[in-house]
């Protein structure tokens, strides 16, 4: 009688284990479909750019087709697309600087302080009207880029949590979900309701302080610039450190749990325990491969999403630096102050954009590198 009971329990255990393996296979297929839908959530322009570098899907084989030449070609193409407005504005600014220097050099009446002040104000106003609106557009474009990237990450996070759970990293998935949802929601809300108005106010202060020496806001502008950059750097450092520490702790916990599960299967399930343990390990390996493909795809997608905004900021910084250099060569001082102020705003926008992109990329990369599978 006891022998029959043992045989019945063994058969029931085998059926449950085989059913679990079959269910896991179906779940893996559903996860693959969810990962493939990430491509559809991107904008048409980003899809086109991803395909231009050889990425048609989050499949690991498609990701391996990315080449250095295709990436450089995409960067050059984006540079040519985003350089027209900054270079056109720079040409106008350089023309104003040259006219200012000519009038200052060849007209004796301009040696009077009041007339020279009028010329300085007029030149600064001309440069202001040329630069302010494009810089405001640059700020708005960067905020839109950050919002789009945050929304994409919010679509990706539940998929990655499911992958982590099925690969034996349930604790890591829960930790990642809580941190990243908070980060993405916070970045999206702060970008539209705080960062964008703050940058526009900062630009207004910089312009006001450069038009006339009677409104001396340069110290305030310098302080705002330093505070913004230090806050961004501090927040990014704390977030990255928190992600790393929690990732290391949860990965160690998940690794012990997975080893305990495999040990239990191989030790307490008779006859086929060792085979089921190896099957469990194989399923984990396939899910880890899916996780790596999804993570690398998201990193590439985030980089492509941020690429136009980052290149625009770099081109603007180069153009403004070129104008400042020419202004210093020909000896005009007041317009140079305006150019320095606008350049400070653009560099702040660039720092914010790069830091937010880095947070998304680092958090995704940590999931790939930390706990590369419950071995």
Outline where the language-model segments fall:
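Gly/Ser-rich, low-complexity
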Residues: 1-97, 101-120, 133-144, 148, ...
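Membrane interface segments of multi-pass transport proteins and intramembrane proteases
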Residues: 108-113, 212-228, 327-336
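Residue-level signal for the membrane-embedded core of alpha-helical transmembrane segments
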Residues: 90, 94-98, 126, 130, ...
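Extended, low-complexity, charged alpha-helical tracts
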Residues: 152-159, 163, 325-329, 333, ...
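Mid-bilayer segments of alpha-helical transmembrane spans in multi-pass integral membrane proteins
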Residues: 121-134, 153-170, 190-198
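Helical hairpin unit composed of two closely spaced alpha helices linked by a short loop
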Residues: 292-333
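Interfacial loop-to-transmembrane junctions
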Residues: 330-350
């Amino acid at each position: 009688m006891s022998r029959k009971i043992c045989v019945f329990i063994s058969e029931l255990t085998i059926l449950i284990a085989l059913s679990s393996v079959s269910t896991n296979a179906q779940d893996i297929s559903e996860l693959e479909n969810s990962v493939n839908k990430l491509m559809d959530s991107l904008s048409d322009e980003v899809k086109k750019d991803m395909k231009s570098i050889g990425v048609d899907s989050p499949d690991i084989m498609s990701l391996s087709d990315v080449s250095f030449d295709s990436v450089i070609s995409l960067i050059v193409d984006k540079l040519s697309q985003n350089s027209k407005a900054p270079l056109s504005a720079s040409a106008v600014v350089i023309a104003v600087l040259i006219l200012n220097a000519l009038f200052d050099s060849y007209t004796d009446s301009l040696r009077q302080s009041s007339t020279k002040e009028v010329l300085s104000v007029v030149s600064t106003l001309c440069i202001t009207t040329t630069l302010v609106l494009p810089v405001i557009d640059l700020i708005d474009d960067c905020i839109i880029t950050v919002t789009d990237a945050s929304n994409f990450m919010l679509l990706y996070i539940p998929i990655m949590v499911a992958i982590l759970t099925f690969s034996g990293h349930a604790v890591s998935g829960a930790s990642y979900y809580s941190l990243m949802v908070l980060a993405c929601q916070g970045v999206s809300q702060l970008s539209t309701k705080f960062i964008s108005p703050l940058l526009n106010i900062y630009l207004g202060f910089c312009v006001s302080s450069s038009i006339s020496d009677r409104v001396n806001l340069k110290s305030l502008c310098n302080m705002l610039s330093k505070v913004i950059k230090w806050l961004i750097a501090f927040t990014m450092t704390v977030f990255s450190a928190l992600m790393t520490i929690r990732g290391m702790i949860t990965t160690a916990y998940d690794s012990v749990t997975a080893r305990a599960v495999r040990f239990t299967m191989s030790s307490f399930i008779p006859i086929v325990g060792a085979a089921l343990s190896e099957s469990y390990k194989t399923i984990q390996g396939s899910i880890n491969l899916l996780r790596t493909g999804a993570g690398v795809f998201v990193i590439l997608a985030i980089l492509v999403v941020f690429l136009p905004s980052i290149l625009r900021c770099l081109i603007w910084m180069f153009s403004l630096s070129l104008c400042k250099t020419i202004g210093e060569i020909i000896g005009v001082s007041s317009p140079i102050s305006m150019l320095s102020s606008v350049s400070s705003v653009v560099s702040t926008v660039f720092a914010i954009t790069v830091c937010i992109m880095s947070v998304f990329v680092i958090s995704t990369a940590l999931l790939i590198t930390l706990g590369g599978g419950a071995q």
